[in-house]
Regions:
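Terminal connector regions
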Residues: 95-123
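Short, acidic/polar linear motifs in exposed loop/turn regions
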Residues: 51-54, 93, 109
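Buried hydrophobic-core signal for structured, non-transmembrane domains
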Residues: 44-50, 87, 101-106, 118
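Bacterial N-terminal signal peptides
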Residues: 1-8
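Beta-sheet-dominated interaction scaffolds and their linkers
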Residues: 13-51, 122-124
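Short, solvent-exposed loop/turn segments enriched in Ser/Thr/Gly
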Residues: 38-45, 94-102
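Surface-exposed binding patches on compact interaction domains or structured appendages
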Residues: 53-84
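Short, hydrophobic beta-strand segments
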Residues: 85-93
Length: 124
């Protein structure tokens, strides 16, 4: 009688675990603070982890302006492993004032597209 109850618990446990690749970022909002347009380019190392149960591939990272550039590898990231997206933000190409840009990370995860926000205050 106890054995069927134990099996019910196992099936419930399996239902809670993710199926497929799932991506988890070190942060989804990157605060750069106050930057002058004459400041050097800002290099940001954004890490992510595959918290799913199959390999994950970052397919594309879309930027919303010419002041940001990204570099990443389209390698398979195995479950439990980490990957990196390098973001370069050039303050000289950003407009003066509040800076708010969204990067779209397209991957093979069950989430599909994730958004990463860059924030700064740009001064002359």
């Amino acid at each position: 009688m106890l054995f069927p109850l134990m099996l019910c618990g196992i099936s419930e446990l399996r239902a809670e675990q993710p199926e497929g690749a799932s991506i988890e970022f070190s942060t989804k909002v990157i605060e750069l603070g106050e930057l002058s347009q004459s400041d050097d380019k800002q290099i940001i190392r954004l890490t992510y982890k595959n918290i799913g149960d199959v390999p994950l591939v970052v397919l594309e990272v879309r930027t919303s302006c010419s002041c940001t550039d990204v570099q990443f590898k389209r390698d398979r990231v195995l479950p439990g492993e980490r990957g990196v997206i390098n973001i370069t933000m050039d303050p000289s190409k950003a407009p003066v004032g509040s800076f708010f840009r969204v990067l779209q990370v397209v991957s093979t995860s069950t989430e599909g597209v994730e958004r990463i926000t860059l924030k700064a205050e740009i001064i002359e």
